[in-house]
């Protein structure tokens, strides 16, 4: 990763490297604003220990989340979800992973009504079946359940049942081993929409491209684009 995660510099850098989509994580502030952040606190990405759900947007926006990565990114702040969409190139997509089990839909509704997000440029992700089901029920936008196969002992039937429970659009699966690769192959062969993460290994990248998965999420977009170019050139 060449820029601090879940920041505008990171998204912009990925777009510049030629990707057609980015994945970001979303949490809700105390005053119900949607911001891009992975963890439930700022401890890992800054010198602050603010808890996201217990602070207002104004308070969280005062925290530098770039300096811990590099002085080059000093004065980089947590973006609103809308700010991430505002820097998105035309005809590109954002995979929006909703981290909590429940959030207010007020801001998402506003973004849909104003045309900021749509089924053409957005795909929701989440780890909670009820949250995914609620997103599907509320919005005309794909929503897919994220799965860590190891939590299911790599059991195809258990995972399939979990996907059905959420009414998931497809499967968003963690790739960590040959077992996980065999699983995603099965899901792809049965016609599921397949998103894979977090793929930083070149061999897995090549194999997933060969398999024809619908999305590969990586911490290293430049490496992935190079692998795609190699495949194109034979």
Per-segment meaning from a language model:
Residues 1-234:
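Phosphate-group recognition and catalysis centered on beta-loop-alpha active-site segments
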